[in-house]
A protein has these predicted regions:
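Active-site flanking residues adjacent to catalytic metal/cofactor-binding acidic residues
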Residues: 113-115, 138, 165, 216-218, ...
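S-adenosyl-L-methionine
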Residues: 1-141, 146-151, 155, 206-208, ...
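General small-molecule cofactor/ligand-binding pocket signal
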Residues: 161-163, 270
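Conserved beta-strand signature within the Rossmann-like core of class I S-adenosyl-L-methionine
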Residues: 240-248
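Short, conserved loop/helix-junction motifs that constitute active-site signature segments
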Residues: 126-130, 233-241
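Conserved acidic residues
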Residues: 166-169, 200
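Short internal loop-to-helix segment that lines adenine-nucleotide cofactor pockets
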Residues: 90-113, 157, 161, 173-175, ...
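Canonical radical SAM enzyme core domain
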Residues: 141-147, 224, 248-252
């Protein structure tokens, strides 16, 4: 494992229980923060390395977290290293292309799966787009489940099911590792004993009575082949996602196992964003 990875110590994360006693809106940005956020959204400060440093500066100007709205959804940001929260705070178009790809063509009762859901960047907009469907939001980090539970409640969203599990090709227990001390870059370590439960995607979906998926997003820091490939190759045809957004390991290249499975099942690469690839199932060909 790369030397920038280390064991995730959950005890070092901020105690969110005390802040969650305050309803959403209690921690709205102050006047100075609002001005700085507006400047950031309109300048280069919303990009790359500028964004993380500028976001940290903004959040340091008040005590406690920040409550913001993104795509009509409520998010409480925790001033803890989390690149997703930096994007939510400063970039009004953050991951919009990726989210819109999944939503386009969905019905009011379409189901979605979000593997590596973090604070709900994808899960919440997907749930709003299909209010009569279900969103299965899976994250191995128990803190992310708590934070997404708070966010969805604040957004008055009732069709998200949050699941605190890691996804792999088998079931067991492991630990979590973190890269660059960023809570958004966390992966499962199956070889180190710990309290993190992992299971297969097919088992998770069966437990939650999901028999059809319109869109699936997966971002689990290198575990994509183990989590997704066995599911795709063994799931009934009806359960195959119509659309998939998957994190790229490097520019213009996808995980080898997933690429083979996509080809076998007639998924077409239809686009790429900065961080992800977009695949659509060709339903007109035999699978």
């Amino acid at each position: 494992m790369n030397s920038t990875w280390s064991k995730l110590e959950l005890s070092k994360s901020k105690n969110i229980s005390q802040h969650n006693d305050y309803s959403f809106g209690y921690f709205i940005p102050n006047k100075l923060q609002r001005v700085m956020i507006l400047i950031g959204k309109k300048t280069i400060l919303k990009r790359g390395l500028f964004r993380s440093k500028y976001a940290k500066l903004i959040m340091s100007l008040s005590k406690g977290p920040l409550d913001i709205i993104f795509r009509k959804c409520s998010f409480r940001l925790w001033n803890e290293s989390n690149l997703i929260e930096y994007g939510l705070l400063l970039d009004p178009n953050y991951n919009n292309e990726d989210i819109d790809f999944l939503i386009h063509g969905a019905k009011k009762n379409s189901n979605f799966v979000d593997i590596g859901s973090n604070v709900g960047l994808y899960s919440q907009p997907l749930a709003l787009a299909s209010p009569n469907g279900r969103v299965i939001s899976i994250d191995a980090n128990p803190l992310m489940k708590l934070r997404l539970d708070f966010n969805k409640k604040s957004s008055n969203i009732s069709n998200i099911k949050t699941i605190n599990l890691a996804v792999s090709d088998t079931s067991g227990k492991g630990s979590l590792i973190i890269r660059k001390n960023d809570i958004a870059i966390v992966a499962l370590d199956e070889n180190t004993s710990g309290d993190i439960n992992f299971s297969t995607l097919i088992e998770i979906l069966e437990t939650n009575n999901i028999d059809e998926i319109y869109g699936l997003k997966i971002d689990i820091e290198g575990h994509e082949d183990k989590a997704l490939v066995p599911f795709l190759l063994n799931a009934p045809k009806k359960l195959l996602p119509k659309k998939i957004v998957i994190e790229k390991p490097i520019k213009n290249q996808d995980y080898a196992g997933c690429v083979k499975a996509f080809k076998k099942l007639n998924y077409n690469l239809v686009g790429r964003s900065k961080n992800n690839s977009f695949y659509a199932l060709n339903v007109h060909e035999k699978t």
